[in-house]
A protein has these predicted regions:
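Bacterial N-terminal signal peptides
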Residues: 8-17
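Tryptophan-paired
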Residues: 65-150, 205-324
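Ser/Thr/Pro-rich, low-complexity mucin-like regions
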Residues: 199-201, 209-215, 285-315, 330-337, ...
Length: 807
C-alpha cells in the first residue's frame, strides 16, 4: 500500500509487522484443533468529516470563538492549513488485525493479520468455524498485534488494549481505526463479513486569526495540552486519564494546525458561558489548545499573553470530552486582551498556573515584558492550615480557594519619590491578579484580592534589577553547635542556602554610602505576619526614622507612624475565637501595623501582673510555673511554621528545626522562613552563642569593633560599612567572598508605638521560631554596634527584616 504521511500520532509499542506480501493471508494465532473457514471481509471507513449527503459517526464539532474581544478590534483571516491529511489519507487502510471472540464465553477464538494494497477495501481472511455467535473486531493501521493477544484472552481485557502515543509526525503511518460486528454466526455466515471502521483518534484543527487594526499579536507557541498518552484501540466507557497519563503536543506555530489525538473523556459540567471555560472551572484533565505570544496594542506596550481553548462539543459550553472519529474545528479570532474573558491570560505567569504560589512574587525589572499575573484564588502557598492558626476559625484544606471579584493596590514604594513600582493592578475573570510594572527599577508593593471592599488576601511584589525568582542569589550557611550548654537545647550541624540580602531589598552589597545603604534594608515584618511594612529611608542614627517614599492606592503618601491600631481595639479575648478575630483582622488589613497593649499583663487576661505579652496578638503569654501557655501564645508560636518541641519545657534552641512553610510565610516560592540556629556560625565563642567580645565575632577583620555609645552606633567612622559582615561558613573569608554576608543596620519598627527605631544601631533578622517555652518572645538575629547575638529574643510585635532560606 502506498505510504501516506501521518501527522500528530506515532504508535510506539506494537508495530510487529509480519513478512506478508500484498494480499497475502497472514498466519492465524490459533491452536491446531480449531477449524477455520475462508471469509470475504469487506471494509469501509465511516467519514470523520462529511457533507449533507454523508453520514458521519458523531459529526463535526465546529466552534467559532472570539478571544479577548475589545471594542473596535478586528482580525485577519487565517491562511491555508498546512501539514494535515487529505480526506483520502484519513480514510486509507494499510493493514488489518482481525480478532474473533465467542459471545458465549467472551474468549478469543481466532486472530489474524493481513496487509492490504493501496485503496483495497476487501481481504480474504479465515475465521474459526463452529464456535457459535461471535463478535469480530477489526483493527486497522496498527501493525501486527496478533501475537500480543493470546488465544483464550477475555474480550474485556482486549477492550483495555492500548498503545502509548506521543507527539510528532509518524512516517508511513495512517490513522488507527477500529470496527466490529457483534452477531457473526460462525456456523452459517462464513461466506462474507462487512465491517465499518471508525478512527480511534479525534482530529483537532485550529484556524487562528490575529488583529489587523493597529494591534499586533506575535505567536510564540501553539500547543495542545492534556493530550491522552494512551490510545485505546476499542472504544469503551473509559474514565478520564490521570494527570500522569497526559502529555503535550507541540506544533510549528503557524495559524492553521491539525493534530490527531486519542480520545479523552474528561467529562462535563453545568457551564453555559464560553468565557468561563478556564482552569478553575473545567475538569483537571481536559484537553485544550494553548496559544502564547506577545500582544502589543496600538500605541501601547507589549505584554505576554496566552489564550486557552478547551475542546468539547461545539454547542455545549459545559462539555469537555474529546471522542474518537470526531473532528474538532476551532476558528479562533484574537481581538484583544479583555480580562473579562476567562480564556485570556494576560502577563507572564509567576505562579505556574497556581502550582507555585507564595505570598511574595519576585520580578526582574530588566525583562522586556512588563505585564505579569499570578493565581489569586490561593492563599500563600496553599498549605493545609489547622484551626489553631486559621484566620477563618476552622481548618483550611490544602489549596483551598477564595473567590475575589476585584483587586487593588494596597501600597507601593516610589523610586526617587516619583517613579511608581506598579502602573496597573487588576483582577481577571479566571482568578489571576494582573499587574503592570511602573517606571521604578527597584521597588516593593502590596496588592490585594478583594470581594467588594473586603480584602480576602494580599501579596508582596518585590521588583528588582538583580534577579527574578529563579535567579535569587543565595549563600551557604552552616550551623555551629555548642552542645551541652546550660539553658540551650542541643542542635546538629546543618547547612542552609540563604538569600544574600534582606527580602525586598535592592542590594546586598556592604556599603556606607547613604543611597546604597538604604537599598539594603528591604522591608519589615511583624512576627508571624505575611505582609511587609516599609523600612527606613535614611542612613542616620535615629529612633524615629522617616520611611522610604510610599503611597497608597489613592496616590496619597503614607506617613511614618501611621495606619496603626492597638490589638486591644480588635479584641481583648483570650480564647480561640479571639485568635481567629486577630488573625482575620491582620489578613483583611495588610496596611495596618498592629501595636501591642501592655495592659494584657493582668491576671484577667492570663498574665502574671508583671510581664506583658509584647505581642501583636493580645494576651499571648508563655508557659510559667507549670502552667500552660495561653491559647494566643500557642497559636503565635506556629504562624511561620516552626514551634517548640515541648511547649512547657523547651529550652532556647529547643524549637522545631524543620520549618514547614505556612500560608503566612512571607517568602517567595521555593523559600521559607529560617530556623533560629541558622546564624550560629556568626560567633566563635565556645561557652555560649552570644557575645560582646569582638575577638569572638566571626566577621571580617575590619568589623571586629565595638561602639558602645547607643547614640553613635554605626555612624562611628571606624565602621567601614553600615552594619556587619559575617562568615556564613568557616572562620575566614573564602575565595570570592562567597561566604561573607552583609547585615545592614536597618533598624526595625517598634511594636509599642510604631516608630522606626534603632536605625544605625541594630542589624536584625527574624527567625520562624519562638524563643523558648517560658518566653513570650520570638527568636531572631540581634546584632548591635556593641554585640553579636545569633540566638536572641525580642517582642513579637516588633517588625524586623527577613532573610529566607531555600526549601
Amino acid at each position: 500500500m502506498k505510504v501516506t504521511k501521518f501527522f500528530g500520532l506515532w504508535i510506539l509499542s506494537v508495530l510487529c509487522v509480519l513478512s506478508c506480501t500484498d494480499e497475502e493471508q497472514g498466519t492465524g494465532n490459533i491452536v491446531p484443533d480449531v477449524a477455520t473457514a475462508p471469509v470475504k471481509l469487506s471494509l469501509d471507513a465511516t467519514p470523520m468529516w462529511g457533507t449533507v449527503s454523508t453520514t458521519r459517526a458523531r459529526g463535526d464539532n465546529s466552534l467559532d470563538l472570539v478571544l479577548g474581544e475589545e471594542a473596535g478590534k478586528t482580525a485577519n483571516t487565517a491562511g491555508t492549513r498546512a501539514g494535515t491529511l487529505t480526506d483520502t489519507q484519513e480514510d486509507a487502510i494499510n493493514d488489518i488485525c482481525v480478532f474473533q471472540f465467542g459471545n458465549a464465553d467472551g474468549k478469543l477464538k481466532y486472530s489474524e493479520y493481513a496487509s492490504l494494497t493501496d485503496g483495497q477495501l476487501t481481504a480474504n481472511i479465515s475465521l474459526a468455524s463452529g464456535v457459535g455467535t461471535c463478535t469480530v473486531y477489526v483493527l486497522a493501521n496498527v501493525g501486527d498485534l496478533t501475537q500480543k493477544v493470546a488465544y483464550g484472552s477475555a474480550v474485556a481485557d482486549f477492550k483495555k488494549f492500548a498503545a502509548e502515543v506521543s507527539s510528532g509526525k509518524g512516517t508511513g503511518q495512517n490513522l488507527p481505526m477500529c470496527g466490529y460486528k457483534t452477531d457473526f454466526n460462525s456456523e452459517t455466515d462464513n461466506a462474507s463479513l462487512t465491517v465499518s471502521l471508525t478512527r480511534a483518534v479525534a482530529k483537532v484543527s485550529l484556524n487562528l486569526t490575529t488583529p489587523n487594526a493597529g494591534d499586533v499579536f506575535t505567536v510564540t507557541s501553539v500547543r495542545l495540552m492534556n493530550v491522552a498518552k494512551k490510545l485505546y484501540y476499542v472504544e469503551s466507557a473509559t474514565t478520564a486519564p490521570t494527570v500522569a497519563e497526559l502529555t503535550t503536543y507541540t506544533s510549528d506555530n503557524t495559524k492553521s494546525i491539525a493534530w490527531y489525538v486519542p480520545e479523552n473523556k474528561a467529562g462535563s459540567n453545568s457551564l453555559t458561558d464560553w468565557k468561563d471555560r478556564y482552569e478553575d472551572n473545567v475538569p483537571a484533565t481536559a484537553t485544550y489548545i494553548l496559544i502564547e505570544g506577545s500582544y502589543t496594542p496600538k500605541g501601547g506596550i507589549a505584554r505576554d499573553v496566552a489564550y486557552t481553548i478547551y475542546l468539547g462539543a461545539g454547542d455545549k459550553a459545559g462539555d469537555f470530552n474529546v471522542v474518537r472519529n470526531t473532528k474538532y474545528t476551532i476558528n479562533a479570532a484574537i481581538k484583544g486582551t479583555n480580562m473579562n474573558d476567562g480564556r485570556v491570560l494576560v502577563g507572564k505567569d509567576l505562579s505556574a498556573a497556581g502550582t507555585q504560589t507564595a505570598n511574595c512574587y519576585v520580578v526582574n525589572t530588566t525583562d522586556a515584558n512588563k505585564w505579569y499575573r499570578f493565581k489569586a484564588t490561593i492563599r500563600g502557598n496553599g498549605a493545609a492550615t489547622s484551626a489553631q492558626i486559621s484566620y477563618t476559625g476552622t481548618d483550611i484544606p490544602a489549596n483551598d480557594r477564595i473567590a475575589p471579584d476585584n483587586a487593588a493596590l494596597v501600597w507601593e514604594t516610589r523610586e526617587g519619590d516619583k517613579a511608581p513600582t506598579l502602573d496597573y493592578v487588576g483582577y481577571s475573570r479566571n482568578g489571576y491578579i494582573v499587574f503592570k510594572l511602573g517606571e521604578a527599577t527597584e521597588g516593593n508593593a502590596v496588592v490585594a484580592a478583594k470581594n467588594g471592599a473586603t480584602t480576602l488576601w494580599s501579596w508582596h511584589i518585590w521588583t528588582t534589577v538583580a534577579f527574578d525568582r529563579n535567579g535569587i542569589k543565595v549563600q551557604t550557611y552552616e550551623t555551629r553547635p555548642r552542645n551541652g550548654l546550660a539553658s540551650y537545647a542541643n542542635i546538629t550541624k546543618r547547612e542552609f542556602k540563604m538569600m544574600d540580602r534582606n527580602l525586598g531589598s535592592a542590594s546586598g552589597t556592604a556599603t556606607k554610602v547613604a543611597e546604597e545603604a538604604i537599598k539594603t534594608y528591604g522591608v519589615y515584618f511583624q512576627f508571624g505576619r505575611k505582609d511587609p511594612f516599609p523600612a527606613a529611608g535614611v542612613m542616620t542614627r535615629t529612633n524615629d526614622a522617616d520611611i522610604v517614599p510610599v503611597y497608597d492606592a489613592n496616590g496619597n503618601k503614607i506617613l511614618k507612624n501611621s495606619n496603626q491600631i492597638k490589638n486591644s481595639a480588635i479584641t481583648t479575648g483570650i480564647d480561640q475565637t479571639a485568635v481567629k478575630a486577630q488573625l482575620a483582622y491582620a489578613v483583611e488589613n495588610p496596611l495596618v501595623f498592629i501595636l501591642r497593649d501592655d495592659n494584657d499583663k493582668t491576671a484577667a487576661y492570663g498574665g502574671d501582673g508583671t510581664n506583658p505579652s509584647y505581642n501583636w496578638i493580645f494576651a499571648a503569654h508563655p508557659a510559667k510555673n507549670d502552667k500552660d501557655g495561653s491559647v494566643p501564645w500557642k497559636a503565635s508560636n506556629k504562624l511561620w511554621g516552626s514551634g517548640l518541641q515541648d511547649e512547657k519545657t523547651s529550652l532556647m534552641l529547643g524549637t522545631i528545626a524543620d520549618v514547614k512553610k505556612t500560608i503566612y510565610d512571607p517568602c517567595p516560592y521555593g523559600y521559607h522562613m529560617p530556623p533560629q540556629d541558622v546564624w550560629t556560625n556568626f560567633t566563635t565563642i565556645t561557652t555560649a552563642y552570644n557575645t560582646g567580645n569582638v575577638t569572638e565575632y566571626n566577621v571580617v577583620a575590619a568589623d571586629k569593633y565595638n561602639q558602645t555609645n547607643e547614640s553613635t552606633g554605626f555612624t562611628d567612622g571606624k565602621f567601614e560599612v553600615w552594619g556587619r559582615r559575617f562568615f556564613t561558613t568557616g572562620d575566614a573569608e573564602a575565595a570570592g567572598a562567597g561566604n561573607v554576608a552583609f547585615y545592614p543596620a536597618a533598624g526595625y519598627r517598634y511594636g509599642y508605638d510604631g516608630h522606626v527605631s534603632h536605625v544605625g544601631w541594630g542589624c536584625y533578622a527574624w527567625s520562624a521560631s519562638p524563643y523558648s517555652a517560658t518566653s513570650q518572645y520570638g527568636g531572631f538575629l540581634d546584632t548591635y554596634s556593641s554585640w553579636v547575638r545569633p540566638v536572641s529574643n525580642t517582642d513579637r510585635s516588633n517588625a524586623f527584616p527577613v532573610r529566607c532560606v531555600r526549601d
